[in-house]
């Protein structure tokens, strides 16, 4: 912080868990033309069916080629007990987490009258590598998401620091995208790359 005062505010930024799973399905389950919000799910689930935005047949290159659908789901609340597994997500094993998320999804899809999500639809699933289940039973998230609280934009650092050869590229960097998103992180990365190139040409 002494070398670059803007870095002194990093510890005051708030972070939270918003990490998820991907379900690889035997069929393309198109629940909506865009993002999904499971409004009353205790774990505040959101999701999106991916293949509708991809080129045809791209899934044939995944794994053994049997998956025809991909449903990405984010868990936004890791502190509330679930409906079907009566524990918060951050206290669940990987298997508990799979069971709880699938049950919440199936319940919401069935209630909406849409095409049902069945257990037999699941080919495989993936939990973000940033979520670590330790041997003592604790769960750690190594990549918490910036929480965009009021006034936080002014405490966020620029991509180019005052420290030689230190550039920042992440969702917490100050950009024109005043919210933690992949787009904001991408913009920060472009700014960091441009700053690095500018320094290279300057020397």
Per-range role (PLM):
Residues 1-156, 162-187, 194, 200-201:
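C-terminal segments that line or cap access tunnels to active or ligand-binding sites in enzymes
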């Amino acid at each position: 912080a002494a070398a670059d005062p803007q870095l002194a505010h990093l510890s005051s930024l708030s972070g939270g868990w918003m990490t998820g799973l991907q379900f690889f399905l035997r069929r393309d389950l198109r629940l909506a033309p865009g993002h999904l919000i499971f409004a009353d799910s205790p774990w505040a689930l959101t999701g999106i069916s991916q293949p509708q935005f991809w080129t045809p047949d791209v899934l044939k290159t995944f794994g053994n080629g049997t998956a025809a659908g991909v449903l990405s789901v984010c868990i936004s609340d890791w502190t509330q007990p679930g409906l079907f597994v009566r524990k918060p997500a951050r206290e669940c094993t990987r298997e508990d987490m799979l069971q709880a998320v699938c049950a919440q999804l199936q319940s919401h899809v069935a209630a909406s009258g849409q095409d049902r999500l069945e257990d037999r639809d699941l080919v495989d699933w993936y939990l973000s590598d940033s979520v670590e289940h330790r041997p003592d039973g604790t769960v750690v998230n190594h990549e918490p998401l910036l929480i965009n609280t009021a006034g936080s934009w002014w405490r966020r650092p620029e991509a180019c620091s005052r420290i030689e050869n230190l550039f920042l590229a992440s969702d917490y960097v100050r950009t024109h995208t005043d919210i933690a998103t992949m787009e904001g992180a991408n913009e920060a990365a472009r700014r960091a790359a441009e700053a690095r190139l500018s320094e290279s040409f300057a020397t």
